[in-house]
């Protein structure tokens, strides 16, 4: 099985452990990231997500398909970027309400999955779009990627 996919058993276990509340997502298409190494803004973008949730406690993860995690925190305390393994950002949380913030370098899609970037050959303008199918949202931002973990979303786009 592709490592980014979760099994039915994993989804059932996480449904019993996590209740997702909200996501604040900033998609930065500008190519300007303060205090970070340069990257190719025609191929990649920076995604920053703050996920708010409650948990019964224990090890858990957010799903994210990204080139790499730039920074992550749990309730304001740093998480190691080494916790990002097989498209999952792992963390351990006690029972209660929590907040994970993760910034990542994500890759534009050329297939319509995740965030698609297209340069129109007629007007030479850049267009971005997404359908954010459940399984493809994780290509643009960190989330608890399964349909039964519903939450509200607030998006900010920097272009």
Predicted feature locations:
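Acidic/His-enriched low-complexity segments
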Residues: 1-159
């Amino acid at each position: 099985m592709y490592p980014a996919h979760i099994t039915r058993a994993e989804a059932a276990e996480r449904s019993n452990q996590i209740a997702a509340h909200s996501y604040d997502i900033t998609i930065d298409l500008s190519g300007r990231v303060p205090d970070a190494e340069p990257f190719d803004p025609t191929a990649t973008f920076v995604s920053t997500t703050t996920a708010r949730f409650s948990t019964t406690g224990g090890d858990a993860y957010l799903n994210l398909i990204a080139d790499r995690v730039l920074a992550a925190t749990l309730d304001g305390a740093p998480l190691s970027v080494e916790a990002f393994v097989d498209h999952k950002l792992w963390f351990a949380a006690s029972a209660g309400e929590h907040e994970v913030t993760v910034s990542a370098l994500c890759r534009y899609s050329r297939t319509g999955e995740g965030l698609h970037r297209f340069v129109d050959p007629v007007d030479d303008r850049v267009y971005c779009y997404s359908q954010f199918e459940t399984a493809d949202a994780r290509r643009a931002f960190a989330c608890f990627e399964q349909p039964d973990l519903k939450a509200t979303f607030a998006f900010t786009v920097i272009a």
